[in-house]
Amino acid sequence: MRDKNTSHNNSQKERIHEIPDLDIIDLENDDLESSFHSSQEESSLPSPSPKEAAGRKKGILSRINIHIVLLAVFLLSIVGIVYKIKTWGVFIDLDEIFKDGPGDYSDTFDVILPLTNADGQPVYLDYGEGTSILMFGNAPLADDRDSEDNLANMIQEMTGATVYNCSVSGSYLAALSPTLNPEEYPMDVFNFYWLCVLAMADNIDDSFRRGVEVLGEDAPAEAMDVFHTLKNVDLNTVDIITVMYDASDYLAGHEMYSDQNATDIVQFTGNLEAGIELIQQKYPNIRIIVLSPTYAYGINEKGEYVSSDIQRYGWDVLSTYVIKQYASCASRSVTFVDNLYGTINEDNADDYLVDHLHLNVKGRKKVAERFVYALNYFQDSGNTSSTEGSR
């Protein structure tokens, strides 16, 4: 017993004096401090729930899907644009289109009106042989004046009428000055309005002569012939007055129209309306037929022919001049023959012009035929009567 107790006590003493294993920590070690804090932070952060983890994964996939969709739309747009460019329209052979010629314009600004009486009622007359026609204008009527190929002479031949050709080469429809001033603007004495005044009164005879004197050698060769014709013709015997000026006003950049003053003579349409107004007031039994300019080419800075629907000279394109002239004639109830779209147009101009402006013989004949068409438009109506009875 004693021995057992003795051995038991000895073993307890051994355990009491047994020194455990210890780790020595260096408190000045920075790595240890950082690892300690990081471990604390990791342990303090809550771990994501399974739902949150699934949501994050779904959000990433959604963003990826949107980008893919946008990329696909962009690529499809590019493909569509390329396809449209390559397949735009249908290639057409112009030679095939015009193999039978350029065709005819079916839409024109023609306004064919009969003469009207004091009550505004139409008077249909038969303009056959014995009809008297007085013509104003410039190159279309003045070129080759003494030739059978002259436009006025062609009309005389086609109608059997007596034609007084008072056109003046190199003249314009629009005046350069609102008042007659032969010293500074001598060519103004030849425009339509002042020629009408010359034919109806004696108060500008001296101004006309002075204009011719100022021009000297540059005066139109027919100037004094026109003067004497207008002073001697009896307007009471005239049945038709015809007015035709070419595109010279457009090419010179002359003013076109005025909304404030319809009879402003420095305007292309105003000068025409002023002359028409004068005729209708003093000679209401005269039918007025206005022939528009035919097509003419514009000329660019290089001297090249260009479309007159593109080239402007201060105001507008040629077609606008013609359309404004049509509106003026409609407002005055006079006949308007649209030569720009109905006679000589951009498609066939090369066949009827000798240059960018002047008519060849075929062109004059075509214009003459259009005039005769307008002159006799109402002849088959059954209501026509002799021009002698209308005077």
Where are these regions (language model features)?
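Active-site segments of SGNH/GDSL-like serine hydrolases
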Residues: 242-256, 276-316
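N-terminal secretory targeting modules
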Residues: 2-164, 378-391
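Second-shell loop/turn segments in exported
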Residues: 139-143, 256-266, 311-315, 352-359
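Conserved SGNH/GDSL esterase-like catalytic core that processes O-acyl groups on lipids
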Residues: 142-254
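Generic structural signal for well-ordered alpha-helices
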Residues: 272-276, 322
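Catalytic His-Asp segment of secreted/periplasmic serine-dependent ester chemistry enzymes
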Residues: 293-391
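Structural recognition of the beta-strand scaffold that forms the well-ordered cores
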Residues: 132-137, 162-167, 239-244, 287-292, ...
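Surface-exposed acidic, glycine-flexible loop patches that form ligand/cofactor-binding
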Residues: 124-125, 221-236, 280-282, 377-384
